Amino acid sequence: RKYAEESSTSLANAYFEIVFGTPDMPRITEEDITASGTDTAIYVIARASGEGKDRTASKGDYYLTDDEEYNISLIRRRYAKVVVIINGGSVIDTAFLKSQNVNSILVVSQLGNVGGHVVADVITGISDPCGRLTDTWAKAYDDYPGKDDFSSNNGNTDDEFYKEGMYVGYRYFDSFGVEPAYPFGYGKSYTDFDIAVAETALDGEVFSAKLVVYNTGSEYAGKQVVQAYVSSPEGSLDKP
């Protein structure tokens, strides 16, 4: 209530502004680096995500802030290994991270109250990062076909009408040959897997397959996400 009064806004707007707000990230100093006494830096990029808010093409939202770029550039020069953790439930721009050649990027999404324990287990090798992306991470904001329909871009906050039709997510990128930064289903592991097709069957309109997944690594246990994709033959109907 106090924030709403000071900001001359409604209680509802005040609630969402606080929830979706992200505190400013201080700049890392040489004193911080000296005091760390390690050759590895772990840097966390935090983004709020939730209902009723699309990514905006602005710094601190889809793009990194000036302070985030400064910090990442500094630690990349001063540390032998740099791990970037993206703590947020939606995509952000990764072009700067790639330009800095960070050693790894760990997307943790929104893990809830046990998120810290989970991240610690993955970083220390207790658990394998077996998850895969459920979104397509584009190389550029303009590559998303629905960007013009985002409420932050067209000002329509009451009703939203997206025009991609069936070409949502990876369907658009795959169908129209738009190369993403990271495709739908992308992910790396501490180990390697081989997948063998043991049996396939077609019963009417139902297709089934039995697979055998082998962990071919020698050091880490892990889980593999089996992904199957179907493409439709070209015809008179619009199909991905």
Where are these regions (language model features)?
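C-terminal non-catalytic regions of proteins with extracellular/luminal or membrane-system context
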Residues: 1-240
